[in-house]
Amino acid sequence: MTIMNGFELHYLSFVYAQEFSSKNNNLGGQMKHIIALASKIAFTLALLYVILDRVYHASFLSVMFIALFLGFVSYLSGDMLVLPRTNNITASLADFGLSFVILWVFVLTQTRNDFSPFGAALLSAACLTVFEYFFHRYLLKNVLDENFRNELSARDNTLQYQTEAADELFPETKEKHKE
């Protein structure tokens, strides 16, 4: 029996969840969101564990709390609100800003070590942004409904500013006709 590291274990669970959801197309949309959220939290935990716990020696309980909070907040705001209305790069940049602020506050308040919270938050947010880019591609392909995305884009792009143009700069008035 071999021992797997966190990345191998997460990859296998992600592949199994993707295979399970593709075989069972009768699963509701809620199950797809639960699988996506669980995968996001698991990978966020694995990534933050490597960076914050192994590199910066933060406690595992703090890392787990940060990963759970960040996973829920970024899934609801970045993946469900920003991504369907914009594109992948914009949503990834929004996730970078959100994760950087959340990580900076949590690392500053939850850890008691002699490292720079700014550097730890910046490195963690940058690594999470790379993951978010590929996670957004997965969401767009497998989780978000095509009708939902089309409905949002049609509703958001309804403002069309147009200008009227006239043949004359000065309109004819009754006084000009009398002369």
Swiss-Prot record:
Q: Name one Pfam family in it.
A: DUF2512
The entry's cellular-component GO terms read: plasma membrane
Q: Does the keyword Membrane apply?
A: yes
- Supply the InterPro entries for this chain: DUF2512
Spans traversing the lipid bilayer? 33-53, 63-83, 89-109, 115-135
- How does the record say this protein sits in the membrane? Multi-pass membrane protein
Tell me where in or outside the cell this protein is found. Cell membrane
Q: Which gene carries the instructions for this protein?
A: yndM
- Provenance organism: Bacillus subtilis (strain 168)
Q: Which key words tag this protein in UniProt?
A: Cell membrane, Membrane, Transmembrane, Transmembrane helix
Record protein name field = Uncharacterized membrane protein YndM
